[in-house]
């Protein structure tokens, strides 16, 4: 009896929502404080996943990324539902990591049971800055007092590689010393992965100043034992992100959700960015697809 070789892919679930204003990422994101809307979005994504499962039966998922915005804004039970659905409808490698871009406030007693049941392996905390004077411009909360509970109580990051940080660089109102302080704070904590996100919009520093911050971060992170495995992405040895590595090395990407980009069999397919269209027709490939072009054309 012949054994069918499965096609290795990585998977992304796109959650283009933010938990705060403003956003510094330069993409169009939706302020996600409407619980009913977020639940409808999850149901729509579930329909899209089910509708495409049969056509992707020859694929094996090597890594899953929950991103595109603050994915943790979705209710923990809804995320658990989606991941259970994926594992029941798709071939998922036994050791496939599941990583999530996370607002620190969502690491709490209400969500963690669902996150643990979903087998999330790393939480990329959107801290943006660890300099106390910058919290007023970068966030609505100062998480300093909560970090011990997040780090040791919920994530147990000191005993497992479960915590990453997202830091913002290249912002006008954050001094070079403030950014340096943030990076040094990272090196003192049980962090296994760092994503450096450049500030976008009116507060963006010029290219030279932003690059100077990036260069300084590279030096500090290298001295602390981190390895740069992709632009602006750093990890402790062995903790490199399999989703980003796979995508960067040309592995096909299955993506679901609003504005998602799927790369498969030499083609890139783009989902609609219209929320109402997606909510109403997520299971209909033709209704939610806005473009299908060869990879070379898209690049």
Give the ranges of each region predicted by the language model.
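C-terminal scaffold of the Radical SAM
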Residues: 6-10, 27-54, 59-299
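Local cysteine-cluster metal-coordination motifs and their immediate loop/turn environment
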Residues: 16-29
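Long, contiguous juxta-domain segments that are non-catalytic but functionally important
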Residues: 1-3
């Amino acid at each position: 009896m012949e054994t069918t070789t499965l096609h290795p892919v990585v998977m992304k679930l796109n959650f283009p929502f933010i938990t705060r204003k403003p956003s510094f990422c330069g993409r169009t994101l939706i302020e996600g404080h409407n619980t009913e809307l977020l639940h409808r979005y999850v149901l729509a994504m579930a329909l899209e996943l089910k509708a495409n499962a049969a056509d992707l039966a020859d694929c094996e998922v090597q890594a899953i990324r929950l991103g595109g915005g603050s994915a943790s804004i979705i209710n923990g039970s809804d995320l658990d539902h989606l991941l259970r659905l994926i594992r029941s409808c798709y071939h998922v490698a036994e050791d496939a990591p599941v990583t999530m871009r996370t607002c620190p406030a969502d690491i709490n007693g209400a969500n963690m049971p669902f996150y643990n049941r979903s087998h999330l392996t790393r939480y990329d905390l959107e801290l943006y800055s660890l300099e106390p004077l910058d919290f007023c411009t970068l966030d609505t909360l100062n998480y300093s007092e909560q970090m011990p509970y997040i780090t040791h109580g919920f994530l147990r990051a000191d005993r497992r590689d479960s915590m990453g940080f997202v830091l913002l660089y290249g912002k006008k109102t954050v001094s070079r010393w403030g950014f340096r302080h943030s990076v040094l704070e990272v090196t003192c904590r049980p962090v296994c992965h760092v994503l450096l996100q450049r500030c976008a919009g009116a507060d963006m520093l010029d290219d030279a100043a932003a690059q100077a911050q990036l260069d300084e971060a590279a030096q500090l992170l290298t001295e602390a034992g981190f390895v740069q495995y992709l632009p602006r992405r750093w990890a402790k040895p062995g903790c490199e992100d399999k989703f980003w590595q796979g995508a960067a090395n040309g592995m096909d990407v299955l993506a679901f959700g609003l504005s998602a980009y799927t790369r498969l069999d030499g083609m890139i397919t783009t989902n609609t960015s219209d929320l109402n269209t997606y909510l109403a027709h997520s299971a209909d490939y033709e209704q939610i697809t806005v473009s299908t072009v060869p990879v070379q054309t898209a690049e």
